[in-house]
Each structure stands twice: as structure tokens, then as C-alpha cells.
Amino acid sequence: MLPPHRRIGVRFANGGKALKRIDLNVDIGEGFPFDRELLKFATSANIGLGEHAGSRELTTETVAYCREAGLRVGAHPGYPHRASMGRDPIPEGEHKVYFDSIFVQCQWFAAMYAPDYLKPHGGFYNDTAVVLPEGWRTENDAPTPYGQEGIFLSKHPGVQFLMMLLRVYKLPLMGLDRTSHAEVARRAGKGFIKEGFADRLYRDNGTLMPRDRPGAVIKDPDRVAEQVRRLAPKVDSICLHGDGPDCLQFAERVRKTLEDAGYEVGA
């Protein structure tokens, strides 16, 4: 069970006024040097599973100190492509190899560590956070092969694969609202944690700007703080990246921005 200060909920102050609680999640266990220091600011940890970066030994070590610190722990599987750190799309004809790797990653991690949720990494995140076609149905029944949903899923096999993972491992999904992430989480029935990114530029359709585009990663701390204030009313969790030289400065700024705005930071 999570310690009392980490549990999901709200507290009341100022004569019974509820303060919204917002989680700060961080991607760690990927071999970068700031993981332990980031835990001072984060309340959830997305732990790499050793294929896009890091190793199983590093994953095991990371889980141990995150649990000790009282953080909520998420499985963070990624494509087994170390050269891009799992950020590139799946190469043509390699879907089965990549999906098999992710399934094995999740199988091992779920059996060993009982994660609290799942958050895809990098290319797996982007490939499964797809804007739904107009008129998408919201019933719980399975999509028909030749209906709108069936055609959509055939074009985006990662979305269907992600839904299968959530059902098999019975986990909530942390992901991008107003995309297929929200829909697969709803269909899997275990919950959805709406996520915003403090340091990433968004496209007009609400998805993330690809990292190779100019300005896709926000490096100005004032702009990061401004984005956090804009996102906070709309999301349940804000992501802090731990792979940049200024990540600790940004993490401290994000947490202070939320607390100064009256939010309670916690999972």
C-alpha cells in the first residue's frame, strides 16, 4: 500500500475547499545519472524494463529504491532499439519482433514487481497515441473487422496490442488524453491516468511534436512553468524527463510551480 502522503485523493483546506492533487511522473531506470535525485520531486516512477535502455539488473535496483521512497511504480516498456533509445517507429515488417519483446518485458516485470500502472515508452507511446477518427463509437463491444474501428486498428496495430497488454496484466494506462490511449484504457476497464508533458511541444491535434522537429523539446524553464500551469487543470499527472542536463532544475521548477498555484503534489 502507498504511504498516506502518496495515496490518490484530495485534501481539504481553507474552510473545506478541495485542492486538486497532481502526480509528477519521471522516466527512470534507463542509465542516466540523476535518477535518485529526481525522486525528491517525483511521486510516480516509470521504470524502464531493460530493452530500450538500461538492463534488468538496473530495473531491479530502481524498483527497490522507488518502493523504499514510497513512489507509485509504473511499467515503462519500450521498443528494443537501443540506437534510438526506443524512440524510432517500428521498421517495416518488424512488428511481431517488437511486440514479442514488449510482451516479454511486461510479463517479467508484472510477475516480479506488481506495477501500479503501465506507460509506454518513446516510439511505443507515440505509435499508440493516435487521434481517433471522427464519429468513433464508444461502446464496449469488440470492433467489427470491416467497421470503422476495425479499419482503424488494422492501420495502427500497436493500439490493439496495447489494449491486449492492459487486459492481460489488468493495469491502468498512463497516457495522452483525446487519443486512442483514452479509448483503449476505457475498453480495458482498469483506469486511465491523463498525462501532460512539462517539456514537450504539442501539435495542434493534441499529440506530441516528434523529437526531431525544431523546438520539440522545451529548454526554457519559464516556458516549462507556463506549460505546467496551462496543463495542470486538464491532467492527472505531469511528466518530468530525466535524460537532460537541466532535469533537476526543471523538476524543482515544475514542482514549485504546481505548489505555488495551490495544487497538492502526490500520486
Where are these regions (language model features)?
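Hydrophobic faces of well-ordered beta-strands that scaffold small-molecule active sites
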Residues: 22-26, 45-47, 73-77, 116-120, ...
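Active-site-adjacent beta->alpha loops and helix N-cap segments on the catalytic face
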Residues: 35, 54-65, 155-157, 178-185, ...
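Acidic (Asp/Glu)-rich catalytic clusters
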Residues: 36-42, 61-74
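Catalytic beta/alpha-barrel core
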Residues: 47-52, 147-155, 170-178
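Short, charge-patterned binding micro-sites
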Residues: 71-91, 119-124
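Glycine/small-residue-rich loop that forms an oxyanion/phosphate-binding "nest" at active or ligand-binding sites
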Residues: 82-117
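Active-site rim beta-loop-alpha module in soluble metabolic enzymes
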Residues: 178-227, 231
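C-terminal helical cap(s) of enzyme catalytic domains, especially alpha/beta-barrels
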Residues: 247-265
